[in-house]
Amino acid sequence: MVYTEENIRELILRVLAPPLALFSLQVQNRKNHALIEIELDHLTDKTGSASLEDCETVSRRLKEELDQWGEEFDFTLQVSSAGAERVLRLPEDLIRFQGLLVKLEVPLESGKWDKRLYRLGPVSGDSVELTLYDRKTRHKKNQKSVSMPIAEIRKGNLYLEI
């Protein structure tokens, strides 16, 4: 049997149960070994973070299933959470994480790119409302929001302020 990323993805999707979902999968096949890296998404958690217990449970169940593929399939399995500062999937995560802080890479008038902190507002059509976030003024009520075309956002991450 050929052990492909697609075979492994199908197995993972059978093992996962809501509210857990597959966030990302990377499989690195070497001569007699595969490195399988899985990131989980927790669909009902505020930041989408899967717990350590969730990761352990999924890891155990996947290992049991992968062990049934036979001794000739040697693998290393790593299961983790996508995390509280995960990469955003645009545009869907802009809706999902509305109200949270994000670090977005956005264009400046000069044509250069800049990473800035924003609080996500509502998505309307092809634009999202963003409130520039400044730690010094975070409690002021008169912070101005801007509407930015989603297509202009190069990339982003959730941002966790501690």
From Swiss-Prot:
Give the UniProt subcellular location, in the record's own words. Answer: Cytoplasm
Primary subcellular site in the record, as a coarse category: cytoplasm
- Tell me which UniProt keywords the record has, alphabetically: Cytoplasm, Ribosome biogenesis
Specify the superkingdom: Bacteria
Q: Which GO terms describe its cellular component?
A: cytosol
> One GO biological process from the UniProt record?
translation
Cite the SUPFAM superfamilies for this sequence: YhbC-like, N-terminal domain
Matching entries from NCBIfam families are given as:
PRK14635.1
Annotated family: Belongs to the RimP family.
- Matching PANTHER family: RIBOSOME MATURATION FACTOR RIMP
The function of this protein is: Required for maturation of 30S ribosomal subunits.
Protein name listed in UniProt: Ribosome maturation factor RimP
Q: Which organism is it from?
A: Leptospira biflexa serovar Patoc (strain Patoc 1 / ATCC 23582 / Paris)
The gene designation is rimP
